[in-house]
Design a protein with these regions (language model features):
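Catalytic cores of peptidoglycan-degrading enzymes
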Residues: 4-128
Length: 128
């Protein structure tokens, strides 16, 4: 089945939008942002294996799932990570909680879809 929405909330950022920082154009936005309250459940958009659960300056708390065939999803700015590296997760399983960690202006989930080294717009694969 296609991917599920990883969180409930309002879409606050779309794939490919141009980012401006200190008046300077930056790289395009390589994900979909879903805004909501801190603690909102984050669900696995598709079944897979947790290959990274860590914290970074920009992305804050971050999870990456490997879905096979070089497809992976990235979940960033999490308040809590509820999965561990190496764990197999089913589509729709709670894997984390929405937060405002890393470089953000408010609580949201940054959700990215990768195919090998390429970032793709996840929206066409999500319901509705």
């Amino acid at each position: 089945r296609p991917f599920d929405w990883p969180a409930q909330g309002r879409v606050s950022g779309v794939f490919g939008s141009q980012r401006i920082l200190n008046g300077q154009p930056r790289q395009p936005h390589y994900g979909l942002d879903v805004a909501g309250p801190v603690g909102t459940p984050i669900l696995a958009a598709q079944s897979g294996r947790v290959v990274l659960a860590a914290e970074f300056h920009f992305f804050g708390r971050l999870l990456v799932l490997d879905h096979g065939h070089r497809v992976h999803t990235l979940y960033a700015h999490l308040s809590e990570i509820e999965s561990r590296e190496g764990q197999e997760v089913r589509q729709g399983a709670r894997i984390a909680r929405m937060g405002a960690t890393g470089r953000v202006t408010g609580p949201h989930l940054h959700f990215s879809l990768g195919l090998g080294p390429l970032w793709l717009d996840p929206r066409p694969l999500l319901p509705g």
